[in-house]
Amino acid sequence: MKPFTVLNGIAALLDRPNVDTDQIIPKQFLRKIERTGFGVHLFHDWRYLDDAGTKLNPEFSLNQERYKGASILLTRDNFGCGSSREHAPWALEDYGFRSIIAPSYADIFFNNCFKNGMLPVVLKSEEVEELFRSVSGNVGAKLQIDLDKQTVTGPTGKVYTFEVDSFRKYCLYNGLDDIGLTLKQGSKIGAFEKKQKEVEPWLYVI
């Protein structure tokens, strides 16, 4: 998992509350277990005018030239609600997003973001509204998200602070997913197995 330290990136606006996981990545695209290749289907029903995904909807915000290459998604309350699917953060990450800023998230989606190297920032509704105004009026506006300092710096230079669980912060900052955390305990696991082979050798008989 790629470490998350400081992110300087274009912020794309998705001015909709209660965006559910079926809108983030529709169910017909959940047929594989690899984590890549989902970005093209992100927000499929909004991004495209046809089922095949060949005709872009010019009215949808992410299709606007000003948001090309965006790595931060600025959105509204209760993002990621609906059915549980880890494909939702996979699709966002595969598209290019590394962080989301919103007033609130659905719990399962919120947890899945951390497990997949994405930082879901929670700011107050009025702070999100300020960022919406400053970004919408500034083409190519970039935000800076500093995980160590737990700050978001807007286009005007105003700094917002956010909270993040210390363990999740440690994992993101060091690029550690569940497998990475386990591998860090490799020497202890090896010592345990060695001891176990001595006292319970029958467990290792093939």
Curated annotation (Swiss-Prot):
GO terms for molecular function: 3-isopropylmalate dehydratase activity. Its EC number is 4.2.1.33. CDD domains: IPMI_Swivel. SUPFAM superfamilies: LeuD/IlvD-like. GO terms for biological process: L-leucine biosynthetic process. InterPro entries: 3-IsopropMal_deHydase_ssu (IPR004431), Aconitase/3IPM_dehydase_swvl (IPR015928), AconitaseA/IPMdHydase_ssu_swvl (IPR000573), IPMI_Swivel (IPR033940), LeuD (IPR050075). Pathway: Amino-acid biosynthesis; L-leucine biosynthesis; L-leucine from 3-methyl-2-oxobutanoate: step 2/4. It is an enzyme of class 4 (lyase). It catalyses: (2R,3S)-3-isopropylmalate = (2S)-2-isopropylmalate. One of its GO terms (cellular component) is 3-isopropylmalate dehydratase complex. Keywords: Amino-acid biosynthesis, Branched-chain amino acid biosynthesis, Leucine biosynthesis, Lyase. Belongs to the LeuD family. LeuD type 1 subfamily. Catalyzes the isomerization between 2-isopropylmalate and 3-isopropylmalate, via the formation of 2-isopropylmaleate. Heterodimer of LeuC and LeuD. This is 3-isopropylmalate dehydratase small subunit. It comes from Leptospira borgpetersenii serovar Hardjo-bovis (strain L550). The gene is leuD.
